[in-house]
């Protein structure tokens, strides 16, 4: 089941990302068009008409001309295309053309897995990343108090029994973080935890 757009918007607002948050989008996200403003969004790999498949977060720092792509499994571009039929090149081209005079931007992409293979918490991990971006836009991926709460593992080991305790701890840290910072999450904790549980996809 995972997270609904309504839930993600409410949590992101609680986390103080409102001034920069453009919204939740399906795979047709148009990219970042403002040349001077910090901006971020949560984007699904599928069309809205499908009900959605997997959430990722995009963020734009105009000062460093850097576009961040946070994808909780840390899949390669090839794997994203293989698993979700998702490509983001056109999004980057549109962002570069609109937001950078020389049409040149840097892409920084997550490459490690922080989410368990059967977890449905991708949207919640995206909210956590956007909190890091809103507070530490120069280093949102790591080396900040928010993302330091979780530990990445090599994507090649995503399904390895060896790393499942680490990935489970990540999800527990995620829930604890949201309990502390999001009144919406606290009010709907049982429902959200059930819909995003560590073994949710395995039990479907």
UniProtKB/Swiss-Prot annotation:
Class in the EC hierarchy, top level: hydrolase
Other remarks on this protein: All late proteins expressed from the major late promoter are produced by alternative splicing and alternative polyadenylation of the same gene giving rise to non-overlapping ORFs. A leader sequence is present in the N-terminus of all these mRNAs and is recognized by the viral shutoff protein to provide expression although conventional translation via ribosome scanning from the cap has been shut off in the host cell.
Induction (UniProt): Expressed in the late phase of the viral replicative cycle.
Task performed by this protein: Cleaves viral precursor proteins (pTP, pIIIa, pVI, pVII, pVIII, and pX) inside newly assembled particles giving rise to mature virions. Protease complexed to its cofactor slides along the viral DNA to specifically locate and cleave the viral precursors. Mature virions have a weakened organization compared to the unmature virions, thereby facilitating subsequent uncoating. Without maturation, the particle lacks infectivity and is unable to uncoat. Late in adenovirus infection, in the cytoplasm, may participate in the cytoskeleton destruction. Cleaves host cell cytoskeletal keratins K7 and K18.
Biological process annotations from GO: proteolysis
Reaction catalysis annotation: Cleaves proteins of the adenovirus and its host cell at two consensus sites: -Yaa-Xaa-Gly-Gly-|-Xaa- and -Yaa-Xaa-Gly-Xaa-|-Gly- (in which Yaa is Met, Ile or Leu, and Xaa is any amino acid)
Originating species: Human adenovirus C serotype 5
Gene Ontology MF terms: cysteine-type endopeptidase activity; DNA binding
Keywords, comma-separated and alphabetical: Autocatalytic cleavage, Disulfide bond, DNA-binding, Host nucleus, Hydrolase, Late protein, Protease, Thiol protease, Virion
Protein name (record): Protease
Site residues, Cleavage: 51-52
InterPro entries attached to this UniProt entry: Papain-like_cys_pep_sf (IPR038765), Peptidase_C5 (IPR000855)
SUPFAM superfamilies: Cysteine proteinases
Main location: virion
Gene: L3
Subcellular location: Virion; Host nucleus
